[in-house]
Amino acid sequence: MKPDSLEHLVLQTESNGFRYYLSTDCPHSSDGVIADLVAGRVQPEIWFKQTRRRHIMSHDGLLIKLYQFHGFSDVRHSRRYASREVECYHDYLKAFGSMPGVRLPKLYGYFEKPFLGFLYRANGIIEEYIPDTRILGMEELSLVPPLFAHLYRKGIYHPDMQFQNVLWQPKTRTLVPIDYMGCNILFEPNWEALLMQLSWFLHAADVDDAHARPFMEEVLSLLPELRLDHEKAWSCIKALYEIPVETHQYHHPIFLPPELRRRTQPDD
């Protein structure tokens, strides 16, 4: 069943047991190419991932993520995948708004292959493919702090804010954040969420402290309203390096481990 928040997506077609809900500006929305790609009748221009459960492909301006579920244990958890991801995607785009030097891929659609009425044999999302992007290099790292400040002020929590999930398009000098699975809109700034996202980003970037700490300090300097002690904030980020991500990544509401919170919380 199409998520309630995606009322702007229209049931465009049904093919091979799949229902395709697409936006009016989705390329190939009416020529059958998307259904052919999902069914394997057309080979995509680029394969990014091809496993038993997950296919990620790009074709003519589209990025398609297909999740396939095998056996009942897979099927009963199927709602955690594309249906959840597409809702997160929609909420993220709506809350983020716009920002100079940052481009978010458009959300073009969602598709599903229902099973027993409320589960899925497969589902997936369709988004805009932004070409000529790559992983950030050290020389672009200094361009990212304003993005963190923007996420903080918009109350956006991105639990997979990894270094590899912020791409760089050299031709336009544009940052492209991707992969919004699990994103939550907190409706108000949250300093704990900010530090957790900084920790994951810097740890995944594998930069030394001589580059990582100035990065954090630049983010905090852009947020004068956030009265965090820089030494305490840095100590918190370093401590989070040692905690397995899954133990605190998806907590709702967002919070740090209690001892870290007590040691780090902003001055009144």
How would you describe each model-predicted region?
Residues P146-L147, L151:
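Conserved hydrophobic core/spine positions of the Hanks-type protein kinase catalytic domain
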Residues Y21-T24, A35-H90:
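ATP-binding glycine-rich loop module of kinase domains
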Residues R153-F163, W168:
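Catalytic-loop of the protein kinase fold
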Residues P131, F163, G182-C183:
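Short, glycine/acidic-enriched loop or turn micro-motifs at the edges of active sites
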Residues Y157, Q169-D268:
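C-lobe/activation-segment region of protein kinase-like
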Residues S78-A82, V86, H90-V144:
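Conserved structural core of kinase catalytic domains
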Residues M1-I46:
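Juxta-kinase regulatory segment immediately upstream of eukaryotic protein kinase catalytic domains
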Residues S58, Y129, L167-Q169:
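Conserved hydrophobic "DFG−1" position in protein kinase catalytic cores
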